[in-house]
Amino acid sequence: VCSSDLVNVQLAKGDARAARALLRSGLTRFPNYQPFRYALVQSLQDSGEHEQALAESEELVKEFRKDARFHEMRARSLAATGQRLRLHQALAEQYYLMGTIPAAIDQLQMAQKAGGGDFYQMSVIEARLRDMRRELASQAPQK
């Protein structure tokens, strides 16, 4: 049995491993319970296990594309692992989902300048940038 209180007790004791075991147990029973999923990624990040946190958050982003918090958590792990291009992409999606399209566009432009991307990654960024610019233009007041 997993409860948020038990997880918090384990985290307060500094036993992130026990907290994660409780969370994973809870997720086997309630696989879509987002508070456990947030807590799992957060505990991995707090323990400095950013590669594992990144793997978890990438799965969550695939499953819950419209959850800005998962994108933010993914961005945090990308920053910790030095993946600048992907960091800016993740932040762009977070900002977009929060309704701040200009900030999302800025992040995609930073991703373009970050370098290190292959042709496919750069094409994805360019396409997303084009879509966001179109959406922003359609929201502008008509004269």
Which residues are covered by each model-predicted region?
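Short, small-residue-biased leader/transition segments that mark boundaries at the very start
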Residues: V1-S3
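Helix-start (N-cap) detector for alpha-helical repeat units in TPR-like alpha-solenoids
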Residues: R17, Q34-P35, A68-R69, L85, ...
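Canonical positions in the second alpha-helix
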Residues: G26, E59-L60, Q94, A111
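Alpha-helical linker/edge segments of TPR/alpha-solenoid repeat scaffolds
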Residues: H50, A80-A90, Y120, R130-K143
